[in-house]
Curated annotation (Swiss-Prot):
Coiled coil: none
Quaternary structure (record): Component of the Mediator complex.
InterPro entries, sorted: Mediator_complex_subunit_1, Mediator_Med1
Keywords associated with the record: Activator, Nucleus, Phosphoprotein, Transcription, Transcription regulation
Function: Component of the Mediator complex, a coactivator involved in the regulated transcription of nearly all RNA polymerase II-dependent genes. Mediator functions as a bridge to convey information from gene-specific regulatory proteins to the basal RNA polymerase II transcription machinery. Mediator is recruited to promoters by direct interactions with regulatory proteins and serves as a scaffold for the assembly of a functional preinitiation complex with RNA polymerase II and the general transcription factors. Required for activated transcription of the MtnA, MtnB and MtnD genes.
Compositional bias segments (type: Pro residues): 944-953
Name the UniProt record assigns to this protein: Mediator of RNA polymerase II transcription subunit 1
Modified residues (Phosphoserine): S830, S834, S854, S858
Compositionally biased residues, Low complexity: 621-641, 711-729, 738-782, 919-934, 954-966, 973-989, 1143-1159, 1185-1225, 1265-1276, 1334-1346, 1399-1409
Biased composition (Polar residues): 1-10, 860-874, 888-897, 1286-1296, 1415-1430, 1442-1458
Organism of this sequence: Drosophila melanogaster
GO BP: any one term: positive regulation of transcription by RNA polymerase II
Length: 1475
């Protein structure tokens, strides 16, 4: 039964079962209540009567009242009283009576007076006739009455809580166990002590001019708030400056006034009280007098001895009562020697260490000891602190400290300040909410040891060295002083900087955060530090190191992070800041601020940097190409914060394992020319390691410093780079590497064989004219034995490549150009190399390289185009555009021939001659180069395709696929061929009239070979997706990256290739890759059904389907050019697709520089091609000639916009051209016929905004399919100031969205090549910091290397990849992808917007021509890149591109302001932590 009872009670079995007695009581109660109800049911009483009878009942005490009941009843009444608003005299009296009773004080009421009294004092409250308050006086036994304004104020405002506190404070003074005559002296003694302390404080206040903080630290008694009414005197001795008041998060407590500090809830303070104790002699008169020191002239306090006149023996002591209990060290506490400390100093429980107490106190008892790691989540990184307990540091929790003389107060306050500093520093590592991450890889592990009370040591692994680093916090002088100890460096300046930070924030995590940032910066310097401002950029300070904005950090929003020191130890840039500081605000998830910095440079650069790092090359050598490369951000400048060595090692191993046959390296040695070039600055110290391979030596540096990016146009003579194979090992392999450095600025990154790093190429934008950047450096080694064999065959065959070297000047056509550029380009061709344009695009003009015929066995000849082309009457030089074969129309070849004046064709008229645009160095527009597999060398003008061998021209940004090489002959070649070649080849094939199966096969082969590498590079792979196999190619072999494969991507000419390019580019770490990406697809646009294969990156827009290959690229600036070149290279399939509307597609070269066949470009002129499919069979290219101005800048802009618009006849208004870097203005090219400007373009031109902006107006997928604009949108934030989206183009970038992975992350990579006009032109491009070139980065590039590479199989679903890379993107992409079926449906417009930036199109195993989405981002890049290339002198910031609604861009910057999990506003944190 009891069981059922329990159940019925509803609370379950645990419930209490009532006893018999309880039941009886209950029944009695109910009976009584029933009686009461019956009694009053007939004659109801008023409430007053009931109240009276109840009261009478209690008074009569019919039975002994349980005191507990009485207390409960009383407290209930008092609570009620508390909620009654006092509006009348009666209410006031009742409330005061209630308060007095609660405090045990007597309350008396007179007509106008109320008294609240105790034995020792009474409070007199005067009311006026109306019953309102007029005055309050406090009478102490031994003193005359004191009028108390505080008490008046709180009663008038109805603040009875404060009134209560004050009454308590007054009565607490007398809580002594003594007779009244002694007791009454207590207040006198307390006042005497307060007077003395106030005198000491006034002494400090006089000589002090400064803020509340310096006063608080310098004053021996802290900040003193005198007694107010019943509130005791308060000394504020510590307040961490970082804490933000709740009200205004933008105002740090460091800006508080003295009063605010004293009233702040964050401050640590102590009040002076009197407590009962054993007998002590306490002063009853002030004992401090100020005496002027004869020697110093300063006033010094002197303390009078206590004697019978000024003191009294009483059972009391003064105490400093702390507002928050504080863990202190027992040893130090005992050393104070205070009277009566024994009770305080002997902790009740077992002895415990200070660290344990600190952890418990700081976590509010949530964490009991130091056994586990303490996680601290900062904006983009997580730290895990392990406290190492020091058994010697026994501690105790102190809440009050006794003292008896004023002289002891300064000692106690000094002790408290020190303990507070120690406590605050260690407690900064403790969070109440411990979020643990499974992902320990991305967490910085630190060990914190309290060596003593004056020293805290934090140990962590140096992110870039295999060693431990130690940060010591010395607390000797009451201020933290930091020292950093490391194996390799004596960080004196860094230690000073950290000391300033530590004093500002008093937080270990923030100091470590800053330290890691500084190491990141330092690492940047080591890697790319040499890259002084970058040739294009100007004086050393200004050029962005990555070509980005001002390096010095001064102009950046986050300049605080830049190094303050004038020059870092390694002598690199003065500012020491990251060029990219602007990007700091990147999306919070992206790994760390540092990474963000990095991000600002071009992603490609970053990757390149990463890869360079991996190669074990001397970090500087990569950049050595020098500063000039600013553009080079690519080189490594990328502020890419290369990831830590972990990654580097991983990749190193990969390379070691997979590429046994890569034996050569390229060493690049800049030989400073006229001292002006920035390059000379950083590089001089670089040691070149000579290893087999190619050595690239710039003979004189370029002077165009002021030009900002525009080296080419500047009067300075461009430097040439000579590439000589150092070892005879496999010349063919290396030969491809020539780097035509158009401008001295060319930064060639040192390449490791495996890394054909074009990296610098994209960045080179900075170097003004398209420095060849590293572009040329594609690694030569082939990735497979097959290739070797093939090459051998080629070499042996009778028709080897000519050995003769044409210098530009000698070559017939070239004379004019060469002279114009004033640079000589020499081309050394190794026997195997296919006719490569010698291209050093010296000045703007330089771009035109000499071309030589390709060897007969070269794939070129076999390509379909080739066959017809050679006969085609139209191409006098035998060049054919990729389309050539099928079409009867003038094709690239004709364009080229037209360009002859501008271009130099080889005397033999070999087909490969490319019409390299000579215009701005970008000229590499080799677009024309017909069959040859040329890659456009770096932007430089090399147009001629290099042999298929493993040249990863991709890298060269020009890698434009322009050369259309059919892969047919060499399947592997595509892989090995530089990616660009391969891509071009495929493109060529496609254009040929359909892709020949062979080409597909080749692509596949390339893919395969590359795949192995891919795995290692998986991260790059994100890009890949590209349609079909193409995407994979990238990693292939020596970094040839399978660009070719990419191109191959689809029989249909699917744009997939583009993504492949990207991969490869990534692989190379080149910006170029990025470019290709861009191109690849953007325009690819589904609209054009199968035929299009666009590979070229820069001109992504050019993708128009029918358009045949207009590849001309006129890269303006190297950096930009690189990206652009790829784009220009795009090759469209010629076959008209029935479905596709013939659209005029304008391929403007991004550089605009490429010459088109039809016209002759004046030396500097850049041209754009307009392709109109006039008939189904062929396209007609119309070339607009631009003014002869040499400015390289012009071309680029247009290219982006010109993108092809499938539908719009007018083709996008074309890009605006920028005013040449020289400043001469170019005509605007709209891509329409010469006379015509299509509306938007023409308007845009005026803006001279970076190309990125030019296209901004269009939607990504316009009907026209013009991808050009995308770029602008992507480029996202406008120029310099904003944080450009670094990510912008690359969708994929895996910028660590996830947990912060510190060092390795390359988050920074994402940004574009930034190399662009280093500071000068801050194109909107992603590289924010750098010139727009960053845009060129392909998404893949941006992906951060640190992520484990996802593995890609052909079949990997695109969305999966996207998910990996960026969930946001994936979401926006999904609809878009659905729209693209193998059937090439044109996605509805509504769907199109979203796809904008996805990196890769699905990869479909079949070669079907699915357009590769990847392209999209690329297109963006293209324009951007081009713009970067041109750094125009005027460098107007581009107009920020309009952001179309669902562009899918990753706008990292958007999250910048969000508060971190710690609740610290990130901006504020940055400003406080930074200098």
């Amino acid at each position: 039964m009891s069981g059922s009872n329990a159940k019925s009670s509803g609370t379950g079995f645990g419930s209490h079962i009532p006893s018999i007695e309880e039941k009886n009581k209950q029944i009695q109660q109910e009976t009584m209540m029933e009686k009461l109800r019956a009694k009053y049911r007939n004659k109801p009483k008023s409430y007053e009567e009931i109240k009276k009878s109840v009261r009478m009942y209690f008074i009569e005490k019919h039975y002994p009242l349980d005191p507990l009941c009485k207390a409960t009843l009383q407290s209930a009444l008092d609570k009620l009283q508390h909620y009654i608003k006092v509006t009348s005299r009666h209410g006031l009296v009742e409330r005061l009576e209630s308060l007095s009773r609660q405090l045990g004080l007597k309350f008396m009421e007179d007509q106008q007076l109320l008294f609240i009294s105790t034995d020792m004092f009474y409070v007199e409250i005067l009311l006026d006739a109306a019953g309102s308050l007029s005055d309050v006086k406090v009478h102490h036994e031994c003193k005359i009455e004191q009028q108390s304004s505080e008490l008046v104020a709180c009663l008038k405002s109805g603040d009875f809580a404060d009134f209560t506190v004050q009454l308590e404070g007054l009565s607490s003074i007398y809580q002594l166990n003594a007779e009244p005559k002694v007791k009454k002296k207590a207040f006198v003694a307390l006042q005497a002590m307060e007077t003395d302390i106030q005198s000491l404080y006034q002494l400090h206040l006089q000589g002090h001019s400064g803020d509340s903080y310096s006063l608080m630290t310098s004053s021996s008694v802290g900040l003193v708030l005198p007694r107010r009414g019943g509130h005791p005197m308060r000394l504020t001795y510590f307040c961490p400056p970082l804490h933000l008041p709740e009200g205004d998060p933008k105002l740090a407590s460091g800006d508080f006034t003295i009063d605010q500090v004293m009233r702040s809830s964050y401050g640590l303070s102590a009040t002076i009280n009197l407590e009962g104790s054993s007998a002590n002699k306490l002063q009853t008169l002030p004992t401090v007098t100020l005496v002027r020191d004869a020697q110093t002239g300063l006033e010094v306090p002197t303390y009078a001895q206590l004697n019978q006149n000024n003191s009294l023996l009483m059972p009391a002591t003064f105490v400093l009562r702390l507002n928050k209990p504080m863990p202190v060290c027992l040893e130090s506490l005992k050393a104070l020697g205070l009277p009566g400390l024994d009770s305080v100093a002997t902790p009740p429980g077992p002895p415990t260490t200070v660290l344990n107490l600190i952890v418990q106190t700081a976590s509010k008892q949530a964490i009991k000891n130091t056994q586990r790691g303490l996680y601290v989540n900062l904006p983009k990184e997580t730290h895990c602190y392990f406290f190492t307990d020091n058994r010697k540091l026994q501690g105790t929790l102190v809440s009050s400290l006794p003292f008896t003389e004023p002289a002891q107060v300064p000692r106690i306050v000094a002790f408290l300040k020190k303990q507070a500093l120690f406590y605050t520093l260690l407690a900064s590592c403790v969070r109440e909410q411990q979020k643990q991450y499974n992902d320990m890889d991305s967490t910085v592990i630190l060990e914190v040891t309290a060596v003593s009370f004056n020293q805290i040591t934090v140990e962590l692994q140096h992110p870039y060295e295999e060693s431990l680093a130690t940060v010591d916090f010395l607390l000797e002088d009451g201020q933290p002083t930091c020292s950093v100890y490391c194996l390799t460096n004596e960080y004196e300046l860094l230690s000073q900087k950290l000391t300033r930070t530590a004093r500002k924030v008093v937080s270990i995590p923030m100091v470590i955060y800053k330290l890691l940032k500084c190491w990141d910066e330092e690492h940047e310097f080591k890697l790319h530090g040499a890259i002084g401002p970058g040739s294009g950029s100007g004086a050393i300070g200004g050029g962005g190191m990555s070509g980005g904005g001002p390096v010095s950090g001064v102009g950046n929003n986050f300049s605080q992070f830049s190094m303050d020191t004038p020059t870092p130890s390694d002598g690199s840039l003065p500012g020491g800041g990251f060029a990219n500081i602007n990007n700091l605000k990147m999306d919070a998830k992206s790994r760390s601020l540092a990474d963000a910095f990095a991000a600002s440079t071009s992603a490609a650069a970053a990757i390149a940097g990463l890869i360079n790092l991996k190669r074990e090359t001397d970090p500087q050598s990569g950049s050595s190409a020098s500063g000039t490369t600013v553009s080079g951000s690519s080189s490594s400048s990328g502020s890419a914060k290369t990831s830590d060595h972990d990654i580097a090692d991983k990749y190193k191993n990969i390379w070691k394992d997979k590429t046994p046959n890569l034996k050569h390296c390229v060493s690049i040695t800049p030989i400073p020319g006229d001292g002006k070039s920035g390059s000379a600055g950083g590089v001089s110290g670089v040691e070149v390691q000579r290893t087999g391979g190619i050595e690239i030596i710039p003979l004189n540096a370029q002077a165009a410093i002021a030009g900002g990016g525009v080296t080419a146009s500047s009067s300075a003579t461009p430097t040439t780079i000579t590439i000589t194979p150092i070892t005879g090992k496999d010349p063919s392999k290396d030969s491809t590497k020539k780097s035509t450095a158009a401008s001295a600025g060319v930064g060639v990154a040192a390449k490791r064989p495996h890394e054909s790093s074009t990296s610098s190429s994209s960045t080179s934008g900075c170097s003004g004219s398209g420095s060849s950047m590293s572009s040329s450096a594609s690694s030569g080694s082939s990735d497979t034995q097959k290739e070797k064999k093939r090459k051998k065959k080629r070499d042996d065959s009778p028709m080897g490549p000519p050995e003769k070297i044409y210098s530009r000047q000698n070559s017939p056509a070239g004379g004019a150009d060469a002279s114009a550029t004033g640079g000589v380009v020499r081309k050394f061709s190794s026997p195997s190399s296919s006719p490569k344009a010698g291209g050093g695009g010296q000045g703007l003009m330089a771009g035109v390289p000499t071309a030589r015929p390709s060897p007969k066995h070269s794939p070129v000849y076999s390509s379909p185009k080739h066959n017809t082309a050679s006969n085609s009457p139209k191409s006098p030089f035998g060049t054919h555009s990729p389309k050539h074969g099928s079409s009867g129309k003038p094709s690239m070849s004709t364009l080229k021939s037209a360009a002859t004046a501008a271009t130099i064709l080889s005397p033999k008229g070999d087909k490969s001659s490319s019409a390299v645009g000579n215009t701005s160095s970008g000229p590499s527009a080799s677009s024309g180069s017909s069959g040859a597999t040329g890659l456009v060398r770096s932007f430089a003008s090399v147009g001629a395709p290099p042999p298929p061998p493993p040249i990863p021209p991709l890298a060269s940004s020009s890698g434009s696929i322009s050369s259309s090489q059919s892969l047919k002959k060499e399947k592997t070649s595509s892989a090995s061929g530089s990616s660009s070649t391969s891509s071009s080849a495929t493109a060529g094939v496609a254009s040929g009239g359909g892709i020949s199966p062979a080409s597909v096969a080749a692509a596949v082969a390339a893919l395969k070979s590359s795949q192995q590498q891919m795995k290692s590079v998986a991260s790059l792979s994100h890009l890949a997706a590209g349609g079909g196999l193409g995407s994979y190619a990238a990693p292939s072999g020596a970094g040839a990256s399978g660009a070719a494969a990419v191109v191959v991507g689809a029989g249909a000419g699917a744009g997939a290739g583009a993504s492949g390019l990207e991969l490869s580019a990534l692989r190379k770490g080149m910006a170029g890759g990025a470019v290709s990406l861009m191109t690849s697809t953007a325009a690819l646009a589904p609209t054009i059904p199968a035929p299009t294969t666009t590979v070229a990156a820069g001109s992504a827009a050019s993708l128009v389907s029918p358009v045949s290959a207009v590849v001309g690229q006129g890269q303006e600036t190297a950096g930009a050019a690189a990206a652009a070149t790829l784009a220009t290279a795009t090759i469209l399939q010629q076959q008209p697709q029935p479905g596709a509307a013939p659209t005029s597609s304008c391929l403007t070269t991004s550089g605009g520089s490429s010459d088109s066949a039809g016209s002759i470009n004046p030396a500097g002129a850049s041209t754009e091609y307009m392709v109109k499919p006039s008939s189904q069979e062929g396209l007609k290219l119309t070339i607009n000639k631009t003014g002869s101005s040499k400015s390289s800048g012009t071309g680029s802009g247009s290219s982006s916009s010109s993108g092809l618009q499938a539908k719009a006849k007018s083709s996008s208004s074309g890009a605006t051209s920028f005013a040449g870097s020289t400043g001469s203005t170019k005509k605007q090219h709209t891509g329409l016929k010469p006379g015509v400007n299509s509306g938007p373009a023409s308007k845009k031109a005026t803006a001279a905004v970076s190309s990125a902006t030019a296209s901004s107006s269009k939607h990504f997928f316009q009907k026209a399919n013009s991808s050009g604009n995308l770029s602008s949108k992507l480029s996202g934030s406008g120029s310099g100031g904003g944080i450009p989206l670094t990510k912008s183009n690359s969708t994929n970038s895996f910028q660590e969205h996830n947990a912060p992975r510190r060092r390795p992350s390359m988050g920074a990579l994402a940004s574009g090549s930034s190399g662009g006009g280093s500071g000068q032109r801050k194109l909107g491009s992603a590289s924010g910091g750098g010139s727009g070139s960053s845009g060129s980065v392909s998404p893949a590039l941006s992906g951060s290397m640190s992520q484990p590479p996802p593995r890609f199989d052909h079949h990997t679903d695109m969305m999966t990849i996207l998910q990996y890379a960026s969930p946001t993107m994936a979401a926006s992409m999904e609809g878009f992808i659905k729209g693209l079926h193998n059937k090439f449906q044109i996605p509805k417009l509504s769907q199109r917007g979203s796809g904008g930036n996805t990196t890769s199109g699905r990869s479909t195993p079949s070669g079907s021509s699915e357009p590769a989405l990847a392209g999209t981002s690329s297109s963006i890049l293209g324009p951007i890149a081009s713009s970067t290339g041109l750094t125009e002198p005027e460098a107007k910031p581009p107009v920020p591109p309009s952001q179309s609604g669902n562009e899918g861009l990753l706008n990292l910057s958007s999250t910048a302001g969000t508060p971190s999990a710690d609740g610290i506003d990130e901006e504020l944190l940055a400003s406080l932590a930074g200098e």
